[in-house]
Amino acid sequence: MTTDIIKTILLVIVIIAAAAVGLIKGDFFSADQKTSQTKEYDETMAFPSDRYPETAKHIKDAINEGHSEVCTIDRDGAEERREQSLKDVPSKKGYDRDEWPMAMCKEGGEGASVEYISPADNRGAGSWVGHRLTDYPDGTKVLFTIQ
C-alpha cells in the first residue's frame, strides 16, 4: 500500500511539473498566445463584400487557390508587377482586369490571379483599399479578410 501511495505522489508531481513547464513556455492552454508569436502580418483589413462583391469574390477565390492573403506594401514596384500580371490577359471591352495579389503588393506580379470584373466594382474597390493603405509605409504586411 505504501508503494501505491508513493507512485501516486510521483505521478502527481510529474503531471504538475509538465503543466508548469507548458504554462511557462506557452505550449498549453493558449492557442491565442501561440498565434500572436507566429503572426506574419502587421495590420488586418476587412474587405467589404457587400460594397464590392466581384472584387471580394475574386480575392476569396484567389486565396483559396493558394495566392497570398497577406499583402506586403511595395509601391515602387507596382507598375512593373502590374505589367507582369496582365501581360498574358488581353483587355476586354466593358471589363477591368482585377489582379490578386494587387500590383502594389510584393506578392503580386507574375503568376497573380487575374479576373475580368465590372469597372465600377474594380475601381471602387481599388479606391477603397488605396485610401485605407495611404498611411501605411512600404514593407507593412496587411492581412486581407473578406467580410
Swiss-Prot record:
According to its UniProt record, the EC number is 3.-.-.-
State what inhibits or activates this protein.
The activity can be inhibited by the 18 kDa competence-specific protein nin.
Cofactor requirement: Mn(2+)
Q: Which UniProt keywords apply?
A: Cell membrane, Competence, Hydrolase, Manganese, Membrane, Nuclease, Transmembrane, Transmembrane helix
The membrane spanning regions, by residue number, are: 8-24
Similarity comment text for this entry: To B.subtilis NucB.
**Which GO BP terms apply?**
establishment of competence for transformation
The free-text cofactor remark is: Mn(2+) ion stimulates activity.
Organism's domain of life?
Bacteria
| Region ranges (Disordered) | 75-100
Q: How does it sit in the membrane?
A: Single-pass membrane protein
Q: How does it assemble?
A: This protein is a subunit of a 75 kDa protein complex, which governs binding and entry of donor DNA. The complex is a tetramer of two subunits of the DNA-entry nuclease and two subunits of a competence-specific protein. Only the complex is able to bind ds- and ss-DNA.
MF terms (GO), sorted A to Z: nuclease activity
Q: Which gene encodes it?
A: nucA
Tell me which species this is from: Bacillus subtilis (strain 168)
Q: What is this protein called?
A: DNA-entry nuclease
Q: Which GO terms describe its cellular component?
A: plasma membrane
- Where found, per UniProt? Cell membrane
- UniProt cross-references to Pfam families, sorted A to Z: DNase_NucA_NucB (PF14040)
Role noted for this protein: By degrading DNA that enters the cell, plays a role in the competence of cells to be transformed. Degrades both double-stranded, linear and covalently closed circular DNA.
